């Protein structure tokens, strides 16, 4: 199992994934779950994704598009249809979890279950502290991700009650 926590810890709420990674490291013994902290997703990550059964991408989302409510938690499965060749862009400076999963499938034949866990941030200004609303929501967000990890580790577990929707 791989957890990819990405964002910029020097841009306020954009660094929330790194805080999640810190919390999850205390909940899972070393070796049980691999946790990476990255500033952004890169094509090289596809190799690591190809070597696991499941990956969870953790990030701050922006409400700027109007599609998100402030401080909204979403945990979504990235569907298998997303892993086709059309998902891979020529431009690698702005990769999404879908593209990394698609690259893993295309280059390595990987079929890891993939999930996106996001929390809508409020401020992305320079700074290393989280907004009050995000600090308040963080424990619930961590609990949701921890529950997903535990269900994925249990062969008889069902993640359907833990995810908001399948993204196809």
Predicted regions and their residues:
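N-terminal catalytic or cofactor-binding beta/alpha core of small enzyme domains
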Residues: 1-119, 123, 128-139, 144-168
